[in-house]
Amino acid sequence: MKPLRQSLPLIFGLALLGLCSSSLAQSPLFAPIYEVLTHPRCLNCHTATDFPRQGDERRRHDQLVVRGDDNHGAPTLQCSACHQDRNVADDEVPGAPHWALAPLSMAWEGLSPQELCVALKDLDKNGNRDLNDLLHHMSEDALVLWGWSPGKNRSRPPYEHEEFVRLLSLWVNAGGPC
């Protein structure tokens, strides 16, 4: 009986550690990245639906367009019918090169911080990008950059792009901890 009694503090400590680890699972390095990637500028196109969303309230696209087989809309209503390489019509119609929905494999809608972190590093879900490719994509891609220049009446992600890239670099250089 004595060995069990001596083991109780260790058992209790391990159990407590297990309880705490799930609540502390999110890496502090990933927290600001999650905050940006779950902002409407990102989630409206990284949606888990068969249609794009728009606005900060993330309503269904006004023209009722659908994803289409190639994520560029249905054959009779492609994204490029309205969305050009830059914002047009007094910034009412947003635009950037290769305007399209992210593939469903890149849907972030509804993911927890842990799930999104894991998905970002999953080559089958992220466009076959390693962490450095992901950093380059989020630093240089014109469609990503549009999120920080969305035109009037559209909010921007919570960090300036330069700061986001700095924070993303810290996360990448640390090995992408979740």
Regions picked out by a protein language model, each given a short descriptive name:
Residues L43-P75:
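N-terminal, post-signal-peptide region of Sec/Tat-exported proteins
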Residues T38-T49, T76-R86:
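The canonical Cys-X-X-Cys-His
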Residues A25-Q26, H61-D62, C82:
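Short amphipathic alpha-helical surface micro-motifs
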Residues K2-Y34, Q54, V65-D70, N87-C178:
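N-terminal export/targeting leaders of redox proteins
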Residues P28, P40, A74-L77, E163:
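Short, well-structured alpha-helical interface segments that form or flank functional binding sites
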